UniProtKB/Swiss-Prot annotation:
Disulfide bonds: none annotated. Pfam families: IspD (PF01128). InterPro entries: IspD, IspD/TarI, IspD/TarI_cytidylyltransf_bact, ISPD_synthase_CS, Nucleotide-diphossugar_trans. Gene3D superfamilies: Spore Coat Polysaccharide Biosynthesis Protein SpsA, Chain A. Catalyzes the formation of 4-diphosphocytidyl-2-C-methyl-D-erythritol from CTP and 2-C-methyl-D-erythritol 4-phosphate (MEP). This is 2-C-methyl-D-erythritol 4-phosphate cytidylyltransferase. It comes from the Bacteria. The gene is ispD.
Length: 233
C-alpha cells in the first residue's frame, strides 16, 4: 500500500487582501505552502505528494516553494480547476494510485498540522475507507435565516472539519466521478462520501491546525510557529 498526499493550493484568498495567492505569503522565513509540504515530505509514512495550483503559477511555485527546499516526495504539480472540487479531481487523476492505496487531501493553507495526526488518520482510512481530522466546536452555533435565529443545535454533537481528509483511493475517485456526473457540489471531500451514503471516521485534531484565510490568521499562525508545540515537523 502506498500513501499519497494531494495539496490543493489554487485559492487566491481574497479575504487575505493580498495580490498573490495566500500560499506564497511568508510565514517565518519561508512561504506558507513550503511549511505544508514539509510536514508530509518529512513523514516516513508518506510516499508521494502532488501539489495542485493554477497552471499559470507553475513557474512561481517551483521557484519559490519546490526548488529551494529540496523536497524528496513531490512528484509533480497539477493544474487546478475552476473550483476546489475540480482541482482535487484533477489531482486524483494525476496520482494514478491503486484501488487500495490511501490518499490524503490537505489544504495548502494549513501549515501547522501536528505530524502525529497523520498516522492515525491513515490507519482510520484503511479501516473505514474514509477519515477526517476535526475538533469539537468551542462556540455556540446558531442556524439563521434572513437575519433571524431559527434554532440552536446541540453543541456537543458539532465538530469543525479540518484537513487532512483521508480515503481509500478507489472510494474517493468514484465519489468525485459521480459528483461530476450528477453536478453535485460538496463542501469538502468527506461530504461526497456522506452524499453517497458512506461512513466517515472523525479523528480529533488540534486547534493549532488553522487554515490561513485572513490577515489575522497569518498573525496567529506566526505566533503558533514561534511557540514550541506538537505541530512542528
Amino acid at each position: 500500500m502506498s500513501v499519497y498526499v494531494l495539496i490543493p493550493a489554487a485559492g487566491m484568498g481574497r479575504r487575505m487582501g493580498a495580490s498573490v495567492n495566500k500560499q506564497y505569503l511568508p510565514l517565518g522565513d519561508r512561504p506558507v505552502l513550503s511549511h505544508t509540504i514539509a510536514l508530509f515530505d518529512r513523514h516516513p509514512g508518506i510516499d508521494h505528494i502532488f501539489v495542485i495550483c493554477p497552471e499559470a503559477e507553475f513557474p512561481l511555485c517551483r521557484r519559490e516553494v519546490i526548488d529551494p527546499y529540496d523536497f524528496r516526495k513531490v512528484r509533480g504539480l497539477v493544474a487546478g480547476g475552476a473550483e476546489r472540487q475540480d482541482s482535487v479531481r484533477n489531482g486524483l487523476q494525476a496520482c494514478q494510485a491503486a484501488e487500495g492505496d490511501i490518499v490524503l487531501i490537505h489544504d495548502g493553507a494549513r501549515p501547522l498540522l501536528p505530524p502525529a495526526l497523520i498516522e492515525p488518520t491513515v490507519a482510520a482510512a484503511q479501516q473505514c475507507g474514509a477519515a477526517i481530522v476535526g475538533v469539537p466546536v468551542k462556540d455556540t452555533i446558531k442556524l439563521v435565516t434572513d437575519g433571524m435565529i431559527d434554532s440552536t443545535p446541540d453543541r456537543s454533537l458539532l465538530w469543525q472539519a479540518q484537513t487532512p481528509q483521508a480515503f481509500r483511493f478507489g472510494l474517493i475517485r468514484d465519489a468525485h466521478a459521480q459528483a461530476l456526473q450528477q453536478h453535485h457540489k460538496g463542501t469538502d471531500d468527506a461530504s461526497l462520501i456522506e452524499w453517497l451514503g458512506g461512513r466517515v471516521a472523525m479523528i480529533e485534531g488540534s486547534y493549532r491546525n488553522i487554515k490561513i484565510t485572513t490577515p489575522e490568521d497569518l498573525v496567529l499562525a506566526q505566533a503558533f510557529l514561534d511557540t514550541p508545540g506538537d505541530f512542528q515537523a
